[in-house]
Amino acid sequence: MKKHFLLAGIAALMLAACNNKPASELTLSGLDPAKFQTEVNNAQTALYTLKNKAGMEVCITNFGGRIVSIMVPDKNGKMQDVVLGFDSIADYINVPSDFGASIGRYANRINQGRFVLDGDTIQLPQNNFGHCLHGGPKGWQYKVYEANLIDPTTLELTLVSPDGDENFPGNVTAKVTYKLTEDNAIDIKYSATTDKKTIINMTNHSYFNLAGDPSKTSTDNIMYVNACLLYTSDAAD
């Protein structure tokens, strides 16, 4: 009987050891990269970590080109995660959302899911109250990008979208490059090439909470957009 208790105790200790990852294997935000490793539509997903010399950290998964966490120092130097995200790829798959995603082919709404191109009317999926939102129900936020970690601060993601993807015309090769600068800025650059006239409108869909605590409200956050042009949309756009 004592032997059985001893074996059970050893098994419990081994299980506990497996469930408690050493801090060195976790990201600064506490993410376990192993929980982002799976296969979606025959493509491998993973978590990529960017770090600069100042200690800032950005975690990105190639599933949807999503920013998962941004650890940045507050005014007192305390590191805080300022974006909303999930702790595993399973959560992103099982709870569909746009958290942190690279949106495409077309961000925002296309009225009634229709647009005219060279005199032809293109009908898209209507996935949002009769309109096409964020490229349709199978938009790029649910695709697996090919990832290339260029250096510790730069990640390039590439996605090939075939002609007719969600009924958009043209074969499109899209690239999203994330660059973490040494002055704690995130530079996101988008580019796309196509073999046929089409429409493209890419963006990032991160949700920020500068309190660094998702249980606190963000209603007192102030955002400044350094833009030369402003587009105002309505419920149908």
Please tell me what each predicted stretch does.
Residues 5-13:
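Sec-dependent N-terminal signal peptides
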Residues 16-17:
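C-terminal motif of bacterial Sec signal peptides marking the signal peptidase cleavage site
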Residues 26-30, 34-44, 51-53, 121, ...:
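Extended, loop-rich substrate-binding clefts of extracytoplasmic carbohydrate-active enzymes
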Residues 36-82, 86, 112-122:
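Beta-strand-rich N-terminal accessory domains
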Residues 51-52, 56-62, 162-215:
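Acidic, contiguous internal or C-terminal segments within carbohydrate-active enzymes
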Residues 78-79, 85-89, 208-230:
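Polysaccharide-binding surfaces and accessory modules of carbohydrate-active proteins
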Residues 78-140, 222:
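Active-site loop/turn microenvironments that scaffold catalytic and metal-binding pockets
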Residues 231-237:
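Conserved small/polar residues in nucleotide/adenosyl-binding loops
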